[in-house]
A protein has these predicted regions:
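Short, Asp-centered acidic motifs that coordinate Mg2+ and/or phosphate
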Residues: 77
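Conserved P-loop
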Residues: 1-74, 121
Length: 160
């Protein structure tokens, strides 16, 4: 963790996969890595995957799709929270491939998910597309698994 907080993975264009149950602290840890990257003068963008997919769909309808895509392709560190909570449509999978391909070995991405990469293939859908996306993510990433009995919200929430 200490080594990752120095942002060498961003400098080397590697990714992080942060896995754990709901409330395990994946978002907290992702944001902490994002803050560390900002402090090291990297550009950072945080977005939940459902919000990203919605933004791309709206941008496509408004004729500004390429402009919006450029924002996600150029940032030094992109944090994708709630990665693959629900299955993707073919259009969404193609959009993600475009982002992942553009960033592969050129920029870093943090993928925060409740599901292990073995389950991602089924969520992406179409086999060839899923293979292309996962190949670019999994083989160039550090993986952090957060294990714990209780939800962070349960431990840190308001006590009666």
């Amino acid at each position: 963790m200490t080594r990752l907080s120095t942002c060498t993975y961003v400098q080397e264009k590697h990714n992080l996969i942060i896995l754990g149950a709901s409330g395990a602290g994946k978002t907290y840890l992702s944001c902490a890595f994002g803050i560390a990257a900002c402090r090291n003068f990297y550009t950072v963008k945080y977005v939940r995957l459902p919000d990203l997919l919605n933004e791309l769909a709206v941008a496509r309808g408004e004729g500004i799709f390429q402009k919006v895509m450029k924002q996600y392709k150029r940032v030094s560190l992109l944090i994708l929270d709630d990665w693959l909570l629900v299955p993707l449509s073919n259009t969404e999978a193609r959009d993600l491939l475009e982002i992942v391909e553009a960033r592969h070995k050129k920029a870093s991405t943090i993928f925060s998910s409740q599901f292990a990469p073995a389950g991602w293939h089924g969520k992406i859908g179409e086999g060839t597309l899923a293979d292309a996306i996962l190949d670019r993510i999994v083989h160039d990433s550090y993986t952090i698994f957060i294990d714990g009995e209780d939800s962070m919200r349960k431990r840190k929430g308001i006590q009666a």
